[in-house]
């Protein structure tokens, strides 16, 4: 059953690929060394879903499980923390390698740097990561959240000591609001995981921070005897994580990259629409962007991420809510000896896309386009755990958002 799923093979004109070098292994290792200096750091699991792979007729399915990241239940802190570190390092005229966690969090550093106010917009995970990092480093955070934000996600950020509001506008308008406030605030800075003309340095640092999870996964695969995945499926909101993941693999395996697909929420499928347009330019999606995949409810793409994606992605997909909910249930009810994975609505959609391509009779053309077969080694990203526990239980226990159901209906 592929009801509501739309996809396209990437035929967008290629650019000069000037941003790919951002995601070189060398640059990503620099970010990873920074993260390793945090006492809360540990490598998150790469879950081996061997029974599911056998059921679906592929060699392997591996899931990078970010529900364990820094105790925050999501990957986003990797980007915000690294961008903060890079910003402070730049302001002080120092290299980030000179500013590990114990230096950044010291009284001496605060005397030297002072205190900045980091503004951001978020559906929950990015803002929580920014607030967490600001709190640990003795800085201030102001977070704007879009309408429809759940109380749990709001409360999680308040607990980190940030100033937080829920606004009556969508995510993209919250970004504009936070940027305008930062510009008017002394020692204010916008830390956003999307880029636009004139604002690219901090988003590029955020993407490099996200690279930590890809570097870990790549190293974990090698420890399991896998040289590289044949397929990588990753979700996208603005495309920062997707650009980081695709960029890392495209740069490292230039001569033999994996087949890579990007999965978006159908209510906010700006990258898919941009791919369909085939102009090379981003197409925005406006309106309320209603989807259970709150972390993917972004209608305006990251210009840096898009530049990488249009050059290296094979398939762009626009995915309905039920596909995400189904994958959340699959993770929660594993086959055989497969591990149980807690994957929230924004975390699970790549597995839902993979399952549909391999399992559904009317998805044979998609399976063929993705070149999936019995030798395929698939890597999917689960970017969050149950960041909204009530919604998670409704999906897993009550079967919410079954076939043909979506938040917008």
Label every model-predicted segment:
Residues 1-409:
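PLP-dependent amino-acid enzyme catalytic core
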């Amino acid at each position: 059953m592929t009801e509501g799923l739309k996809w396209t093979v990437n035929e967008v004109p290629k650019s000069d690929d000037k941003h790919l070098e951002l995601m070189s292994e060398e640059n990503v290792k620099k970010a990873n060394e920074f993260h390793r200096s945090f006492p809360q750091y540990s490598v998150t699991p790469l879950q081996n879903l061997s029974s599911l792979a056998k059921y679906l007729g592929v060699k392997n399915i591996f899931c990078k499980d970010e529900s364990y990241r820094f105790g925050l239940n999501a990957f986003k802190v990797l980007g915000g923390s690294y961008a903060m570190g890079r910003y402070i390092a730049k302001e002080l005229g120092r290299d980030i390698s000179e500013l590990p966690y114990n230096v950044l969090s010291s009284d001496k550093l605060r005397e030297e740097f002072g205190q900045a106010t980091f503004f951001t917009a978020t559906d929950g995970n990015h803002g929580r990561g920014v607030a967490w990092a600001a709190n640990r480093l003795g800085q201030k955070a102001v977070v704007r959240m879009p309408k429809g934000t759940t109380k749990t996600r709001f409360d999680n950020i308040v607990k980190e000591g940030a100033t937080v509001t829920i606004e009556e506008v969508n995510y993209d308008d919250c970004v504009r609001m936070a940027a305008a406030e930062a510009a008017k605030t002394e020692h204010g800075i916008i830390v956003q995981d999307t880029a636009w003309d004139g604002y690219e340095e901090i988003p590029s640092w955020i993407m490099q921070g996200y690279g930590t999870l890809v570097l870990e996964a790549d190293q974990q695969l090698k420890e399991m005897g896998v040289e590289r995945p044949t397929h990588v499926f990753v979700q996208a909101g603005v495309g920062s994580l997707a650009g980081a993941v695709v960029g890392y693999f495209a740069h490292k395996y230039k001569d033999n990259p994996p087949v890579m697909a990007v999965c978006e929420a159908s209510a906010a499928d700006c990258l898919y629409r941009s791919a369909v347009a085939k102009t090379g330019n981003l197409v925005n999606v406006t309106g309320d962007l209603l989807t259970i995949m709150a972390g993917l409810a972004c209608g305006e793409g990251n210009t840096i991420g898009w530049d990488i994606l249009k050059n290296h992605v094979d398939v762009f997909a626009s995915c309905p809510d039920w596909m995400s909910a189904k994958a959340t249930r699959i993770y929660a009810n594993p086959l055989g000896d497969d591990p149980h994975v807690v994957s929230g609505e924004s975390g699970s959609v790549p597995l839902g896309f993979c399952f549909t391509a391999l399992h559904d009779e009317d998805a044979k053309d998609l399976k063929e386009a993705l070149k999936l077969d019995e030798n395929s080694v698939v890597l999917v990203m689960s970017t969050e755990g149950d960041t909204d526990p009530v919604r998670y239980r409704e999906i897993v226990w009550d079967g919410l958002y079954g076939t043909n159901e979506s938040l917008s209906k």
